[in-house]
């Protein structure tokens, strides 16, 4: 019986995928025969799996290049596990990541677990709360795809209008949408455990260029679209808009032109996402 299905896709990161495979092989206190690993290959990564633990049920799917959400939906059709996770191609696990996740899920109280992300230098990859707690609709505890371990629901898939590669430039929010749908419509209980770690590179020294601005803009469109899709209250939306507006003013006053411009693109993207309608 499969307990956990891991869904991963990549276009051109064979070294990072190999690192993930190594971290998966190094998991302790688990039965590898209960792990399913589904990889949607949009490039040429087959050699990364030559040393994968043979007890793991490996599913390899060759695909043309596509959006992240579409690739995950391809894999979701093959899931056999009770739970599903979505490790990024450049993330990697601590040796006890999966066993600690199991310790929460096996209690039978929670349908899912989300954890904390750290980079190579053991610095948080986002603003994660210091204390563990139950996930709530208005407090997802900085949950992001690679930190999620969730009960599999056969009728739920990713919104392909959202995420990296979106045809509508809605470049983020697909995992938050998936998680919120589980909370709102499937009545799932999900626990955030600050002691469970998944590693992921952090863009601390990302270049301050047009690419960074476009990324901020696309992500902001995703944030705005997510707010409307899940009927977030007006005060929540206003707070969401005021922050980048203040950022524009503050960074302009302090003569930080790139940061001011990035705040502008975030505000612009969030407004566009809030008003976006599918044709």
What do the PLM-derived regions correspond to, one by one?
Residues 63-79:
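Glycine-rich, basic loop-to-helix element that forms the pyrophosphate-binding segment
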Residues 213-222, 228, 232-279:
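Non-catalytic, C-terminal membrane-associated alpha-helical segments of glycosyltransferases
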Residues 12, 23, 38-49, 65, ...:
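A conserved acidic beta->alpha catalytic loop
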Residues 84:
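Short aromatic/hydrophobic "clamp" motif used to bind/position activated sugar donors
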Residues 12-28:
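Short, well-formed alpha-helical segments that are part of the catalytic scaffolds
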Residues 163-167, 191-211, 223-226:
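Active-site donor/metal-binding and catalytic loop motifs
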Residues 164-180:
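Acidic donor-binding loop at a coil-to-helix junction in glycosyltransferase catalytic cores
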């Amino acid at each position: 019986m499969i307990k956990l299905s891991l869904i991963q896709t990549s276009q051109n990161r064979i070294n990072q995928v190999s690192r993930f495979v190594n971290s998966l092989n190094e998991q302790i206190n688990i039965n590898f025969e209960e792990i399913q690993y589904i990889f949607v290959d949009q490039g040429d990564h087959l050699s990364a799996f030559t040393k994968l633990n043979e007890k793991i049920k490996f599913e390899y799917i060759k695909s043309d290049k596509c959006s992240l959400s579409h690739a995950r939906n391809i894999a979701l059709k093959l899931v056999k596990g009770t739970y599903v996770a979505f490790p990024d191609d450049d993330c990697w696990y601590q040796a006890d990541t999966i066993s600690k996740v199991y310790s929460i899920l096996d209690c039978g109280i929670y349908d899912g677990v989300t954890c904390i992300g750290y980079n190579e230098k053991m610095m948080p990859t986002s603003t994660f709360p210091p204390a563990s707690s139950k996930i709530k609709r208005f407090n997802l505890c900085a949950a992001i795809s690679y930190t999620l371990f969730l009960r599999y629901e056969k009728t739920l898939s990713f919104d392909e209008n959202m995420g990296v590669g979106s045809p509508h430039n809605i470049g983020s929010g697909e995992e938050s949408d998936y998680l919120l749908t589980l909370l709102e419509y499937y009545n799932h209980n999900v626990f955030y455990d600050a002691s469970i770690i998944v590693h992921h590179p952090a863009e601390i020294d990302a270049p301050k260029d047009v690419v960074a601005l476009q990324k901020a803009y696309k992500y902001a469109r995703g944030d705005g679209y997510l707010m409307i899709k899940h009927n977030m209250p007006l005060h929540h939306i206003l707070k969401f808009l005021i922050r980048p507006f203040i950022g524009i003013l503050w960074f302009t006053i302090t003569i930080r032109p790139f940061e001011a411009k990035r705040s502008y693109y975030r505000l612009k993207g969030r407004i566009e996402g809030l008003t976006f309608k599918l044709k």
